[in-house]
Structures are given as C-alpha cells and as structure tokens.
Regions:
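Conserved histidines in hydrophobic membrane contexts and catalytic metal-binding motifs
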Residues: 1-352
Length: 352
C-alpha cells in the first residue's frame, strides 16, 4: 500500500468514526468535562448546601445526632465532613433505590455553629447524578459500561488517525502549525484544535477503556454492586473516640467502618489516618490520601488530585470533541456539495 493509499485509508476511518458517532461522542465528552469539577458544579446547583457559616462549635457526635433524627428510619451513616462550610453527613437509604447507576446516597446539611438542620436530600444534585450515570453507561442498563468502553476505543483510534492526518504531506512538519492551512475557518479550527487536544484526548480514551475493560470482556457486569461495602450500623468506637485517637486538626472527612474494612478512615488534607474500630489502633498513610484512594489511571481520567493544570486540560478535552464533531461534519457536507456541483457540471458539459 502506497503512502497516498494509506493516508486515504486513515482518512476514511477518521471521517466515518466522527460522522457516525458524533451524536454520542459530544454528550459523552461534555458530561466528562462536567465531572472534572463535579464538586464545584454541585455547589452552584445546590448553593444552600454550601452556604458560608461560622466555625464548628459542637462535638461531632452532636452533629451525628441531628443527622440521625433527620434521616429516614433504617438509614446507615456512611461519612461526615466537618470544617468546610456546613457539616455534611452522608448515608445509605433503608432500602436500595433500584435506580441505575451508583447507589443512591442521602445527604444531611447542618449549620456547624448552631447545630441546626439546613436541609436534607440526595448527596449530590440530580443533574450531577445524571451526568455520572450517562458518562459511565449512557443510561443503558447492564451493558452500558461496555458500550462506553468500545466508544473509547473508537475515540482513541480517531485521535491517532487525526494526528496522522494533521502531519503535513510535504515540507517541514512545522507547516502543520500554520493557522491558514485551509481557506475556511472550520477546517483551520478542526486541524489546529485537533492537534493540540489529540494527546490528552488519547489519554482520556485509553484510561476510559481501562476502566471499562472488565465489562468489555463480558465479566463483572455490575462492578458497583460487587465492590459495594456496607457501613456498620453499630461500631465498637464512637465517632468522638475515633477522632480523638486520630488527633487531627482542621477540616476532616470521616468514613465509617464497613463489613469489609473495619476501620474508621479520617482524611485531613493529603493525609489519611485509619483507626481500627476493634482496638483503636492508629495507622497513617504516608503516601497521601489521593494515591491510596484511587488508582493512577482513574485520577488521570477524572483529574482527582492531579492539580489545576491537568484538570483544565481534561476540561478542554471534553469540550474539544464537540467543536471537532461540528467542524468535521461541516467540512464533510461542504465536500459533498462540491462533488455534487462538479458532477453536475460534468453532466452538463457531456450533454452539450
């Protein structure tokens, strides 16, 4: 196969991936951009849950009592956050919701200064929950995550073929950075944005495939249910005893012991302290909270603990496919019109 034939083959693959899957790629990528800063968006959508208030003036157990009275009977406390705005308590409902996506979580928000109840509801806004479910499974029951994984393969292939097609056919490779490689704005946007976002988009696609790989291979069809841990309804240590053993200062997030891990997890800054619920033994993770909490490929994909620069790149990596999809389709339609005009002119000339 000659270089021209190979380039044309890559072009056809790149073109038809973009045309056929644009309507799926665009919302999938945009929801990914939303999830990079899901906490910030949740604050915008539910401002009352994050309203500024005074410093914590009560003991953690007092906040816990307020939350228990506000939650439905039979709810199981999972976590508490103290020190950043209102105190937030997260719990699982008495019965599974039966809804698709991650298990439903209830939230209770408490004024830290007075201990008064601010509000109750889902732990995150319905919009953000929808974004999580759509990005992870396209709202498709069962096989949705596998479908998203194969879309990641297509996106990775599109990124690689796009980079190949960006490379100038003649002359120095630096010609590829020229803004006016083409006579139309959409084509110039497509080539310039496509080059700069190709590597981040490829990383996003590859890590997305890794996350979905078990489901793509037909195993572990419900990973959230398999990995779900049940918080202990009754613990040996009280909340106050666990925090006293941890000896932490400032904002903290406390996670309750579970049936699989019988330890209190107390996150303070970049430090994770574990307190054994049976004997109060304390251990400290010296390598940081984030690295223990999530694998590196997941943090590459969602930006957790990766710094502002990478989060901005990920955000743009979610916006770019929308621009590339629209400009690519415009370029394709223009080419179709041009070919139709050429064919009509040839037919007119032949008829004379």
């Amino acid at each position: 196969m000659s270089k021209v034939q190979l380039r044309n083959a890559w072009f056809q693959i790149h073109k038809w991936i973009g045309i056929l899957l644009a309507l799926v790629f665009i919302p999938l990528s945009l929801t990914g951009s939303m999830l990079v800063w899901d906490d910030a968006l949740d604050r915008m959508l539910e401002p009352s849950h994050y309203a500024p208030s005074g410093p914590a003036a009560l003991s953690p157990s007092q906040y816990l009592d307020v939350a228990r009275h506000a939650l439905p009977a039979g709810s199981t406390i999972q976590a508490m956050r103290i020190g950043e705005g209102p105190v937030m308590v997260t719990a699982s409902p008495p019965k599974p919701s039966g809804m698709r996506g991650p298990p439903l979580r209830l939230g209770v928000w408490i004024d830290p200064a007075s201990g008064k109840l601010i509000g109750t509801g889902l732990s995150n806004s319905p919009v953000m929950r929808w974004a999580h479910i759509f990005h992870g499974s396209l709202q498709i029951p069962g096989s949705g995550r596998a479908v998203v994984g194969w879309l990641g393969v297509a996106m990775l292939l599109s990124s690689l073929t796009g980079l190949w097609l960006w490379w100038p056919v003649t002359g120095s490779w630096t010609r590829g950075f020229r803004w006016k490689r083409h006579t139309t704005l959409d084509a110039n946007l497509h080539h310039m944005i496509g080059f700069w976002i190709a590597l981040p988009l490829g990383i996003l696609s590859l890590t997305g495939v890794i996350i979905a790989w078990p489901q793509m291979m037909g195993s572990d069809t419900n990973p959230m249910r398999r990995a779900m841990q049940t918080p202990l309804a009754t613990t040996h240590l009280t909340l106050d005893q666990a925090l006293t053993a941890a000896s932490v200062q400032g904002p903290v997030t406390i996670t309750w012991p579970t049936d699989k891990e019988g330890v209190w997890k107390i996150a303070s800054g970049q430090k994770m302290i574990q307190v054994d619920d049976r004997n109060g033994a304390v251990s400290v993770a010296k390598d940081g909270m984030m690295s223990r909490a999530r694998p590196f490929y997941r943090r590459l994909h969602d930006g957790t603990g990766m710094g502002l620069v990478w989060q901005i790149i990920l955000f743009l990596g979610g916006i770019a496919p929308a621009v590339l999809g629209v400009t690519g389709i415009v370029m394709w339609l223009r080419t179709r019109r041009w070919r139709a005009d050429v064919a009509q002119r040839k037919a007119t000339i032949a008829a004379r």
